[in-house]
């Protein structure tokens, strides 16, 4: 257990205070990433509605370094606890159906009466404004992928959902910078700010130029699977031994180095298809098809290791497709600490992804695993001025709640679904 005052000082965001009342991935990921950078993050949940991600493998990674507070904001006492934390926080982030907190009587204006300078971040599937029939709709990852149009760009004959949870995670990353931008605005203006993050818009924003291409010129690119829909020599290729490798032979200097390898003339040496300064071409054109055929002939005559070695020797971007075991065993992954180990209150000693974005002067840390449901209630409430008698009363009234490890294991059947915990129980 830990309280607000127990949070260690480290990282680029030491001292930043965040209240996160979101659930699943799209909202909480933002707070989780900032907690790794040293922000003090309290994950706030309702006593009867634990975060849906609890009990899944991703929870220990997305919620490490956080504190857990559980209270019923629909009750008078629980609402007071929530507003006390609003008063404490620099940023409040929530994820729910559009307008959910307005319906609870906790509009932005009410929040700013309590803390005039707080940065408010609303995360939802469809946004807080727009067509009323959309705003209150529920959304999961696949909904965001489908509604954004992004899913239609992938696959071959049928649209393809990208795993795992691309829409959720892109929205979470968008939420992360929205939180910081909103907070910086409060610093620059001295006034609170609120930002509306819609899951589908976060994913639509990374469609590159596809929407401009279609909305402006009526051109809709076909689904091409692992082949790039536009650029030639920017795809996965099957080699002589049946193994697959990605090769990206685009850009003027790369084409100069790479074309002789696959039997094409160096740009600028007389072939009209490849003039001086040639950087690449559209895959669906005659020139693009000529380039593709040359590459396919080359890889059909060489093993994947041979292709990889030659491409790397000439500084041509390439990469064989790694399985997870390849990631774990790769020397570069190991050297950067991309994989690390830590202790988690729910799952015990685990191995997973380490800290990304390596800060030189203010490094990030993992100082604790993801807390159990309500694990830090008592310490947080004491930091807010509650005494033991009052805290006991809140528990008796069901306004606050918590699960110990045994309750957690039974509720989520962890001894059945998590292999290393099953062995532990046996």
Swiss-Prot record:
Q: In which pathway does it act?
A: Lipid metabolism; bile acid biosynthesis
Indicate the residues that form the catalytic site: 168 (nucleophile)
Enzyme Commission number(s) of this protein? 2.8.3.25
Can you state which reaction this protein catalyses? lithocholoyl-CoA + cholate = choloyl-CoA + lithocholate; deoxycholoyl-CoA + cholate = choloyl-CoA + deoxycholate; allodeoxycholoyl-CoA + cholate = allodeoxycholate + choloyl-CoA; allocholate + deoxycholoyl-CoA = allocholoyl-CoA + deoxycholate
Characterize the pH dependence. Answer: Optimum pH is between pH 6.0 and 7.0 or the hydrolysis of choloyl-CoA. No activity is detected below pH 4.0 or above pH 9.0.
Q: Which GO terms describe its biological process?
A: bile acid biosynthetic process; bile acid catabolic process; lipid catabolic process
Q: Would I find DNA repair among this entry's keywords? A: no
Q: What induces it?
A: Induced by bile acids.
Q: Name one GO molecular function term.
A: choloyl-CoA hydrolase activity
Query: Which cysteine-cysteine pairs are annotated as disulfide bonds in the entry?
Result: none
Q: So which domain of life are we looking at?
A: Bacteria
Q: Name one GO cellular component term.
A: cytoplasm
Under which main EC class is this enzyme filed? transferase
| Keyword terms of this UniProt record | Bile acid catabolism, Hydrolase, Lipid degradation, Lipid metabolism, Steroid metabolism, Transferase
Q: What does this protein do?
A: Functions in the bile acid 7alpha-dehydroxylation pathway, which forms secondary bile acids via the 7alpha-dehydroxylation of primary bile acids, and is carried out by intestinal anaerobic bacteria. Acts as a bile acid CoA transferase with broad bile acid substrate specificity. Catalyzes the transfer of the CoA moiety of secondary bile acid-CoA compounds to primary bile acids. Can use lithocholoyl-CoA, deoxycholoyl-CoA and allodeoxycholoyl-CoA as bile acid CoA donors and cholate, allocholate, chenodeoxycholate, ursodeoxycholate, and beta-muricholate as bile acid CoA acceptors.
Similarity section: Belongs to the CoA-transferase III family.
What this protein is called in its record is: Bile acid CoA-transferase BaiF
Q: Which organism is it from?
A: Clostridium scindens (strain JCM 10418 / VPI 12708)
Identify the gene encoding this protein.
baiF
